[in-house]
Amino acid sequence: GFIFDFCGVEVDRVTGAVRVDKYVTMHDCGRVLHPGMVAGQITGGFAQGIGAALYEEFAYSPDGAFLAGTFADYLLPTSTEVPVPVILHVETPSPFTPLGAKGVGEGNCMSTPVCLANAVADALGLDAIDLPMTPAKLAAHIHPAEQAPNRARGLS
């Protein structure tokens, strides 16, 4: 299938927290055979994308050991952190499948982090931004002068 996304975000300039005000995702998965299943697939991919964009950080020690080996250390969004996206469809049946269906559900795993990163970078006036966009990382962009003393002492 095919997909496009757009969103509006707010970045708290004190805490560095990101709030997704509105998220719209449009899918062309050919003929929609089961609307509930399609919505579930899109919503699940969207939740994974929120995690990749804002929460899930692969932390390693200086000797290369993985530090986030449990869910106590590796943050994933819960249903309270995942906003409800607006899901739109356009149906252009595939000529290559018997019922005209195409793939659906995987797209938001890839498009959501990019969409959110572009929105946050635009909100902060940045050319690029690394994922995940944790409050600490965003605070370093918002208040770089305040981060410099901590970096000098090895605290960031």
Where are these regions (language model features)?
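C-terminal catalytic domains of large/alpha subunits in multi-subunit enzymes
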Residues: 1-156
